[in-house]
Amino acid sequence: MAEIKNYTLNFGPQHPAAHGVLRLVLELDGEVIQRADPHIGLLHRATEKLAESKTFIQSVPYMDRLDYVSMMVNEHGYVLAIEKLLGIEVPERAQYIRVLFDEITRVLNHLMWIGAHALDVGAMAVFLYAFREREDLMDVYEAVSGARMHAAYYRPGGVYRDLPDAMPQYKASKIRNEKALAKMNEARSGSVLDFIDDFFTRFPKCVDEYETLLTDNRIWKQRLVGIGVVSPERALQMGLTGPMLRGSGIAWDLRKKQPYEVYDRMDFDVPVGVNGDCYDRYLVRVEEMRQSILIAKQCIEWLRKNPGPVMTDNHKVAPPSRVGMKTNMEDLIHHFKLFTEGFHVPEGEAYAAVEHPKGEFGIYLVSDGANKPYRLKIRAPGFAHLASLDEMARGHMIADAVTIIGTQDIVFGEIDR
């Protein structure tokens, strides 16, 4: 009698559902996955090593390029670690701006996730809806930093600059008539804060639209319910964090459990799943978008009433003002020294973690008293999530592997780093 053997299948690295450069070696029995072996390192750029030869401030742009969908939250973890070692206080207004932009970034990430995840499973429309809203948030990034993605907006000691008074306007072109242009610029007539406020006022309706398309959709439920179930105990053992952990029913959120910046003053809830399957993780992330709206609204309200500095007054860390630099020789020398040599950080080590849209993003920083890190270790949430893929995919079909990769919300910039 013929012997029945399992066969091996390569999934990726150029598969559209592999989310970048994932190579999965699947061992299949018919169409059922017996083993899933992720091969990583195809996007390795030696970020941790490069940081050792750059001054502390020069490594901020590297952080944007780790998880390139949640740019500012990566920077946040890095600057928090530096601030811990320096022992400096960040002005209150800068803390509120950081929290506001963390939540904007969370929404940006979850919009990308819901669009891509639905597209992988076969729902095309959601992708188009989600990117409509991402466009507005990208414009907010551009307004404060000049870049749509890699912002490098956070600085050790605060943020690069205060929120501008004017929002960039759409310019006239051949493809837009006057009426369409006026409608597009309607919300852009005020300040950046007005634009963000307007966005978060209309955004709940947009989230309702995504839910209309997906939550009770029969096909969506058939593809997600009961797939990739992780028990609360296993979720903890495998080092899952963020929505992956909360989807399994554990209410662990660093914004509540280990508050940083002004999160302890924010009023919001932590959404938690029940069954620990892909559908619960979907519901958790959708509810997280709604909670981000609440947090952002509270920040906007405070920022309107409380003007103030957005950078520490510690001159070892903060650059001089532009006016001072162009009128005063000492300020010019100070500016030159700060951006060529950088500041020296006292000897020691620090770990700072933030509640990243994907989980716990941590930076472990070791300083030997020089102007560069002695060692920088990045704790990427996606790394632990990808490690759990084998266990989650076992016994499921090939098509379900796509769903599981989608629910893990994997980005390879941070995994391979």
Swiss-Prot record:
InterPro entries: NADH_Q_OxRdtase_suD, NADH_UbQ_OxRdtase_49kDa_CS, NDH1_su_D/H, NiFe-Hase_large. It is found in: Cell inner membrane. GO terms for molecular function: NAD binding; NADH:ubiquinone reductase (non-electrogenic) activity; quinone binding. The keyword Transcription regulation does not apply. It is a peripheral membrane protein. One of its GO terms (cellular component) is plasma membrane. Keywords: Cell inner membrane, Cell membrane, Membrane, NAD, Quinone, Translocase, Transport, Ubiquinone. Its main location: membrane. PROSITE patterns: COMPLEX1_49K. It catalyses: a quinone + NADH + 5 H(+)(in) = a quinol + NAD(+) + 4 H(+)(out). Its EC number is 7.1.1.-. NCBIfam families: NuoD, PRK06075.1. Belongs to the complex I 49 kDa subunit family. NDH-1 shuttles electrons from NADH, via FMN and iron-sulfur (Fe-S) centers, to quinones in the respiratory chain. The immediate electron acceptor for the enzyme in this species is believed to be ubiquinone. Couples the redox reaction to proton translocation (for every two electrons transferred, four hydrogen ions are translocated across the cytoplasmic membrane), and thus conserves the redox energy in a proton gradient. NDH-1 is composed of 14 different subunits. Subunits NuoB, C, D, E, F, and G constitute the peripheral sector of the complex. This is NADH-quinone oxidoreductase subunit D. The gene is nuoD.
